[in-house]
Amino acid sequence: MNSDLALLRLLQLASPGLPVGGFTYSQGLEWAVEAGWVRGVDSFVGWQREQVHDTLACLDWPVLARLYRACQAEDAEAFGHWSRFLLANRETAELRLEEQQRGAALARLLDGWQLGQAPAWRASLELTQLGGMAWLAAHWAIPLRQLALGHGFAWLEGAVMAGVKLVPFGQQAAQTLLRDLGADLPAALDQALALGDDQLGGGLPLLAIASSRHETQYTRLFRS
């Protein structure tokens, strides 16, 4: 696949129109606002920046790299291992369910394209969204670094759009946040790709508490 077509496929994977429900989740932000932990743009920046340097850099991106390489090597066993590892590291029932729902939605898209149908792969593809993204990226010859940055920007965009509704702040502030927080991604990715297997894993106690409390929050805009 030529580089132009690979870029277009990456834009498709990173698009908010990808039918995986990306804008239906707040990943704990809704409770963080309710509790007063996030009160404005500055505290929102702190909330998201911690996730960039912990969740993305120490868990999601290193696992994405391993999933991608497993696809390139046609190693379904390794792919299944890292898919289960990622799911096990989602710290709350809400976050695990979100991951599985996103993964199942992307697997259904693959079904519609008659891709990823081999039994050795299909069950693992349903577990996480990252698994489906890695599989498609390897299939479409999207370079790993571009895949990770596309995934990171899509995640960041979803968080900022949730912030528009919840914090709240306006569209000008939202675009400024995407510009400024997005500038953190390349260096965080360098860190992520340098980690060994025994260094993987993230943990943000306030995020876990916020997600747990969101499960029973009385008034919610976002899915649990």
Swiss-Prot record:
A GO CC term attached to the entry: cytoplasm
Keyword annotations from UniProtKB, A to Z: Chaperone, Cytoplasm, Nickel insertion
GO terms for MF: nickel cation binding
Record localization: Cytoplasm
Family to which this protein belongs: Belongs to the UreF family.
Role summary: Required for maturation of urease via the functional incorporation of the urease nickel metallocenter.
Subunit structure, interactors included: UreD, UreF and UreG form a complex that acts as a GTP-hydrolysis-dependent molecular chaperone, activating the urease apoprotein by helping to assemble the nickel containing metallocenter of UreC. The UreE protein probably delivers the nickel.
HAMAP family: UreF
Protein name: Urease accessory protein UreF
